[in-house]
Amino acid sequence: MAEMEIDAVRENLKEVFDFVTAELKTRTEDKKLIRQIKLCVEEIFLNISSYAYNPGTGSAKIKVSVEGNPVPIRVYLTFMDNGHPFDPLSEEAPDTEAELDDREAGGLGIFLVKNTVDGISYEYKEGQNILTIVKELPVDSEA
């Protein structure tokens, strides 16, 4: 397992991407899969940087582990922050069938994450938001 702790500010997104990508490339070169995971990382990290400590700032801890030998191989990404308690899984799914002008703002990002990953969980424990996403690697994507 690899982990990093970083200031939860938008400007650090590239560093988070580099960290996650380096860990993923130890097990896969599947560019589509890496793009999907990076999209989820972007949504989650930017939500932490925008809302977790508002007003104010704080840090985010990101853990990456790849498990499974030989298959199925699963990538676990855990995001932790000490910000305001917020369970994104409790939010109502946006109405993607509604006209754009009739939609409520927000919620599309976590909807996208939920529909991209194979598993997602949230807990608030000891003053921390802990969000974990799981993505299964296709059998033929192992490096």
At which residue positions do the language-model features occur?
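Conserved beta-strand-loop-beta-strand hairpin that lines the nucleotide-binding pocket
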Residues: M1-E3, S49-A143
